[in-house]
């Protein structure tokens, strides 16, 4: 617990440059599409952590960046968010980046993650005494699947009794979490990532997904599905929450990160699981309405949006 009596969340994972090119006309694959390019600091863990900090959680981040202009921008964004920056800078390397192409509706058509530096450098950082001390001082741990599997296992070992929350990042990276599913207090993912983890087919029903994840050792999860119902289960109880329709979706980037950050903030503040998920969905809905993966909103805006999220329904 920090001196300000805010619970402290120590996070390990991505903090890099997000580039997004969005078509302003109906997207045509394999062709040049008129559009708009935007870039901003992002990364799964970093986006979620900024949201949690907005909601009253003290935050510390361990990431990796290069000694370039982009790295300086990322460092400034971490400081601006009021997050303790325990990241390591490799002066001779380029900062990781994520580049996405969006269609005219703001949905991702394709994306490239240039993040080899995480693979090489993050596992070594977890052996540092400073990191062990930071984990010991935290109330909870948060990671994303930008870490390779061996680093995730090491972090789970360092956490000991502390809650561990994780973000799946992508279907390709979600499978890295398989060996620590039993250590997680909640895993945040979308339907595609859940199917990658379980090996189920595209037609799998919610109950099947829930049962397969439980059988794999994961006892708590939140699974988003775009405009479809969000599935959340906690031990023996499973819920669905229908997201309200969002007029004028600007950009889907960061919506899943916001879901994680908002839910984690609620859980760390003692909110019941199903209500914390509603808070996470509120943050996600607000994010969908902006061209930023980490928007800033007032408490009044948050409360107004929360009133639009329906109560959770038990999955029977």
Where are these regions (language model features)?
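Short beta-strand scaffold segments in enzyme catalytic cores
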Residues: 50, 97-101, 110, 229-233
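A glycine-rich helix N-cap at a beta->alpha junction
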Residues: 77-93
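Short gly/ser/thr-rich secondary-structure transition/capping motifs
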Residues: 82, 121-126, 166-172
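Glycosyltransferases and closely related glycan-assembly transferases
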Residues: 133-136, 151-163
């Amino acid at each position: 617990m920090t001196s300000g009596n805010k619970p402290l969340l120590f996070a390990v994972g991505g903090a890099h440059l997000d580039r997004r090119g969005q078509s302003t006309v109906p997207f045509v694959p394999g062709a040049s599409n008129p559009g708009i390019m935007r870039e901003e600091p992002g990364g799964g863990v970093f986006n979620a952590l900024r949201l949690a900090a907005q909601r009253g959680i003290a935050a510390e981040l361990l990431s990796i960046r290069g000694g370039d202009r982009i790295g300086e921008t990322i460092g400034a964004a971490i400081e601006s968010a009021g997050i303790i920056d325990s990241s390591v800078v490799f002066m001779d390397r380029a900062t990781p980046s994520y580049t996405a192409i969006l269609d005219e509706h703001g949905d991702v058509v394709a994306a490239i993650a240039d993040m080899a530096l995480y693979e090489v450098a993050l596992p070594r950082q977890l052996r540092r005494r400073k990191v062990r001390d930071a984990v010991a001082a935290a109330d909870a741990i948060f990671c994303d699947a930008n870490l390779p599997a061996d680093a995730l296992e090491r972090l789970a070992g360092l956490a000991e009794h502390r809650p561990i929350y994780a973000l799946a990042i992508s279907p390709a990276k979600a499978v890295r979490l398989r060996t620590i599913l039993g250590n997680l207090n909640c895993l945040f993912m979308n339907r595609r990532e859940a199917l990658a983890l379980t090996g189920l087919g595209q037609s799998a029903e919610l109950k099947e997904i829930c049962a397969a994840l439980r059988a794999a050792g994961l006892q708590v999860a939140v699974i988003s599905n775009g405009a479809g119902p969000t599935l959340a289960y906690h031990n023996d109880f499973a819920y669905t929450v229908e997201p309200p329709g969002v007029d004028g979706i600007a950009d889907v980037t960061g919506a899943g990160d916001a879901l994680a950050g908002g839910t984690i903030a609620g859980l760390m503040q003692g909110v019941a699981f199903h209500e914390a998920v509603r808070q996470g969905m509120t943050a996600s809905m607000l994010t969908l309405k902006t061209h930023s993966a980490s928007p800033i909103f007032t408490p009044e805006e948050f409360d107004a949006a929360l009133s639009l999220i329906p109560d959770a329904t038990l999955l029977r």
